[in-house]
Amino acid sequence: MRWLLSILVRVVLVLCLCFAPLGIPVVARAAELPPVKHLDTPIDVNNTILRNYRQLPGFYPTLARILVKNAPYKSLEDMLQISGLTEQQKALIKANAENFVFGEYQEGANQLENRINQGYYG
């Protein structure tokens, strides 16, 4: 009976050691934000194309698409009011606030479909 308990303890220990590392990085990554990158030329959130958000870690493609589709904005607070943003996405926008400018929206100059897909293939 003692040997059976010893084997059972070893099996449980091996399973814990095998599966424990799988869960820890996932939890740690979910709580962390990508590093903030300072841009020399800020992004004009009202007139930029989707691909410009590739410069900012964590934005491209999902958050970038949300921001492009919901433009124009008057301020950072307007960006944070987008329906459906997660707390992590809001934190990412706030952390990168210095990389955004709110230029006057040029309606007709950049149609939404062209701001999302400029046809760069290859």
Curated annotation (Swiss-Prot):
Subcellular localization: Cellular thylakoid membrane
Annotated gene: psbU
Entry protein name: Photosystem II extrinsic protein U
SUPFAM superfamilies xref list: PsbU/PolX domain-like (SSF81585)
GO terms (BP aspect): photosynthesis; photosystem II stabilization
Similarity comment: Belongs to the PsbU family.
Organism: Synechococcus sp. (strain JA-2-3B'a(2-13))
Job description of the protein: One of the extrinsic, lumenal subunits of photosystem II (PSII). PSII is a light-driven water plastoquinone oxidoreductase, using light energy to abstract electrons from H(2)O, generating a proton gradient subsequently used for ATP formation. The extrinsic proteins stabilize the structure of photosystem II oxygen-evolving complex (OEC), the ion environment of oxygen evolution and protect the OEC against heat-induced inactivation.
Keywords associated with the record: Electron transport, Membrane, Photosynthesis, Photosystem II, Signal, Thylakoid, Transport
Binding partners and assembly: PSII is composed of 1 copy each of membrane proteins PsbA, PsbB, PsbC, PsbD, PsbE, PsbF, PsbH, PsbI, PsbJ, PsbK, PsbL, PsbM, PsbT, PsbX, PsbY, PsbZ, Psb30/Ycf12, peripheral proteins PsbO, CyanoQ (PsbQ), PsbU, PsbV and a large number of cofactors. It forms dimeric complexes.
